Amino acid sequence: MAKRYLLDFEKPLVELEKQIEQIKELARDSEVDVSQQLLQLETLAARRREEIFKSLTPAQKIQVARHPQRPSTLDFVQMFCDDWIELHGDRNGGDDMALIGGIGSINNRPVLMLGHQKGRDTKENVVRNFGMAKPGGYRKALRLMQHANRFALPILTFIDTPGAYAGLKAEEQGQGEAIARNLREMFGLKVPIVATVIGEGGSGGALGIGVADRLLMFEHSVYTVASPEACASILWRDAAKAPEAASALKITGNDLLKLGIIDEVLPEPSGGNNWAPLDAGNTLKEAIEKHLNALLQMPEDQLIEERYKKFRILGKFIEANNIEEIYSEIPQKTE
C-alpha cells in the first residue's frame, strides 16, 4: 500500500501513523502477536481523524479536495464497471488527456462516463495537464455526449479540475467558445445527465461538463466560480488572503446545497475519500443509480424543461433607480 500523504492539519496523526507502521513491520518480521496494540492505535487514530474532519474550514476542505491520493475519474470508472471502453479524439486533430470519456455499463445499464483526470505524480500530471482541459478536451466531451444522445445513453460526468487551461494557445484555439458551446448543447440533450464534483470544481472548466439534471458533490469537494487564491489576488491583491476568500465564496457542499446550486451532498469516509476509496465508490454508485432511476421515468420534454429551469433560477440581482436604493436592500452589518 502506498504511503499515506497527510495534510498539514492532520499533523496530530503523524506520530500515531508512525507507531501503527512500526507495529505492522514488527508483525511482519516476527511471530509476536501485536493485534491488540494495533487495534487500540488504529481505533485511537480513527477517532482523532473523525474529530479533525468534523470541523474543517473551507480552506482545509480545499486541501482535501486537492489531495493527491483522492479517487479520480478513472478510479471510479474502474470501480463501477468491468467493460469500460475509452473513446478518443475531438475529430479535429486533438485528444486532450485532461478530459477523458468512454462507454461502460453499471448494473447492465449502458452509460457514457466522462470527466477530468489528474495525475498521481509530476510525470502523470504533465501528461494530464493537472486536470486542466484545453479546447480539444471540451470538444471531445461534446462529441461523446452527442454520441450518447444519439444512442439514448445516460451521461455521467465527474468534475475535478482547478479550471480550464488558460494558456495563450488555448485562448487562440477558442477555449471560451468551446465551453460556451458545451453549455448550450447540454441544455438540449434528451438523455439524463448526472454530474458529480469528486474533487475540485473550478470555474468554467467545471461548467463545461456540469450542465446536468442532478449535480452531486462529495462533502469535502469544492465548487467555485474562481479559486480562492485567484479571488484573493483580485480583491485584496494578496494570495495569502485565500482562506478568507474561501469562506466568502461559499464553496462547500453544505453552503451550495442551501443556495440550491447542488442537489445532494454525499458523505465521505472518516479522513476523506482517499482513506477508503471503495467506500466512496459505493456511496457514489448508489447515489447515481437513485437519481438515474428517477430521471429515466421522465419524458424527454420534461427532462429538458426542468434542466433549463434548474439553471435559470440560479442567482439574483437587485434593480433600482439609484445607488441609495440598492444599498437600502442590502442587510447592514451590526456592530
From Swiss-Prot:
Associated pathway: Lipid metabolism; malonyl-CoA biosynthesis; malonyl-CoA from acetyl-CoA: step 1/1
The Gene Ontology biological process annotation of the record reads: fatty acid biosynthetic process; malonyl-CoA biosynthetic process
Q: Which GO terms describe its cellular component?
A: acetyl-CoA carboxylase complex
Does the record's keyword annotation contain Nucleotide-binding? yes
Parts of the chain that traverse the membrane: none
Q: What reaction does this enzyme carry out catalytically?
A: N(6)-carboxybiotinyl-L-lysyl-[protein] + acetyl-CoA = N(6)-biotinyl-L-lysyl-[protein] + malonyl-CoA
Q: Pfam families, per this entry?
A: ACCA
Q: Which GO terms describe its molecular function?
A: acetyl-CoA carboxylase activity; ATP binding; carboxyl- or carbamoyltransferase activity
For this UniProt record, the keywords arranged alphabetically read as follows: ATP-binding, Cytoplasm, Fatty acid biosynthesis, Fatty acid metabolism, Lipid biosynthesis, Lipid metabolism, Nucleotide-binding, Transferase
Compartments where located: Cytoplasm
Q: What is its EC number?
A: 2.1.3.15
Indicate the enzyme's highest-level EC class: transferase
Q: Which residues form the CoA carboxyltransferase C-terminal domain?
A: 40-294
* Assembly notes: Acetyl-CoA carboxylase is a heterohexamer composed of biotin carboxyl carrier protein (AccB), biotin carboxylase (AccC) and two subunits each of ACCase subunit alpha (AccA) and ACCase subunit beta (AccD).
Protein task: Component of the acetyl coenzyme A carboxylase (ACC) complex. First, biotin carboxylase catalyzes the carboxylation of biotin on its carrier protein (BCCP) and then the CO(2) group is transferred by the carboxyltransferase to acetyl-CoA to form malonyl-CoA.
Q: Which family does it belong to?
A: Belongs to the AccA family.
Q: What is this protein called?
A: Acetyl-coenzyme A carboxylase carboxyl transferase subunit alpha
Coding gene? accA
